[in-house]
């Protein structure tokens, strides 16, 4: 029997937070960042359609702040990205459109995973993000399948990256279960190839 994959069947999963965060209040944009930091964020923000970093930072949609954090991936700017993601976390709730949560958790996971070898909390935060994205998987897959603007189910960052993480940890049975679950939900990837490769690894471990 395959193990239960974390996140399966849950719409929302609790965050494992690095620290207690206050509820959003007041002018968070000017309170969280110095004038110099705000100028830095505006300076690196260069969307194709124009706009300001401040407009995204003041949004109540976590995906907007996640989008802004993606512009702060350089090592010397990552602390600013962490602040944006901390703020975004306080905005996650069941009123946020499920597709926005799906993309936010992918961005959040990717951002933290990038710094897994630099910051001691980063890998755990990345795993938590991918688990939360997986928890929304079945509902989001249904949306992609039925929405006329999509009509297909793309790849899933959470399933893909968490599979890699669990393989690196030697958790082959869990990695296989992730593949099976992602395949069942219809997410694009060569899941049969991954399952076959993992099966060979598991068989070799028994000999």
Region spans (language model):
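Boundary/linker segments of alpha-helical solenoid repeat arrays
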Residues: 96-100, 137-145, 184-195
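Amphipathic alpha-helical repeat scaffolds of TPR domains
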Residues: 57-71, 96-118, 127-134, 138, ...
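Structural motif corresponding to the intra-repeat A-B loop/turn of tetratricopeptide repeats
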Residues: 75, 115-116, 120, 169, ...
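Helix-turn-helix repeat elements of alpha-solenoid scaffolds
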Residues: 33-46, 74-88, 120-139
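Solenoid-like repeat scaffolds
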Residues: 53-57, 90-97, 183-186
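Helical anchoring/docking segments at protein termini
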Residues: 1-79
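TPR/TPR-like (Sel1-like) alpha-helical repeat modules
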Residues: 128-135, 172-188
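Eukaryotic acidic, Ser/Thr-rich intrinsically disordered low-complexity regions
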Residues: 179-207
């Amino acid at each position: 029997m395959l193990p239960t994959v974390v996140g399966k069947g849950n719409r929302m999963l609790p965050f494992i937070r690095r620290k207690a965060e206050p509820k959003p209040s007041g002018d968070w944009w000017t309170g969280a960042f110095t004038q110099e930091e705000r100028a830095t964020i505006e300076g690196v923000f260069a969307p194709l359609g124009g706009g300001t970093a401040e407009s995204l930072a003041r949004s109540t949609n976590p995906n907007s702040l996640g989008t802004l954090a993606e512009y702060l991936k350089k090592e010397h700017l990552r602390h600013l990205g962490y602040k944006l993601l901390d703020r975004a976390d306080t905005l996650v709730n069941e009123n946020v459109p499920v597709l926005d949560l799906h993309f936010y958790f992918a961005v959040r996971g990717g951002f933290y995973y990038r710094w897994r070898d630099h910051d001691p909390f980063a890998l755990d935060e990345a795993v938590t993000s991918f688990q939360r994205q997986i928890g929304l998987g079945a509902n989001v897959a249904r949306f992609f399948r039925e929405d006329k603007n999509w009509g297909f189910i793309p790849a899933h960052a959470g399933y893909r990256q968490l599979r890699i993480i669990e393989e690196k940890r030697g958790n082959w049975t869990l990695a296989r279960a992730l593949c099976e679950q992602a395949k069942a939900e219809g997410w694009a990837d060569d899941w049969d190839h991954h399952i076959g490769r993992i099966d060979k690894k598991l068989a070799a471990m028994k000999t």
